Amino acid sequence: MFFDLYEIILYILFFCVIFYGFLSFIELFYYLRDPRKRKKIIYIIIYIFCFLILMYILLIMDSYFIVNIIEFYQKYENGFKFFDNINRVILMHLEKGFNFFKSLF
């Protein structure tokens, strides 16, 4: 459960940072049209650098999380049996969905 909660929090932060960076770029292009707002442009460029630093930190955290999960499941005798079970469940649901749509036509 800890890994699921950590992953959810990480991806929420990731999308918030992406949204923040997107808004900063829009604001930058808005203020580039008005030469009287030079001071605002400097602040927005600083915001964009902060955005890039946050993205780098989140990508490091995400790769660290994936490595921890792989090491956690490699400790067991069966290795990646957990991932095989997940793949079987996904394929089973895809097959059920395909059969449902096939029965409609």
From Swiss-Prot:
Taxonomy, superkingdom: Eukaryota
Entry GO terms, CC: plastid
Keywords annotated in UniProt: Plastid
Subcellular location: Plastid
Name listed for the protein in its UniProt record: Uncharacterized 13.3 kDa protein in rpl23-rpl2 intergenic region
Organism expressing this protein natively: Euglena longa (Euglenophycean alga)
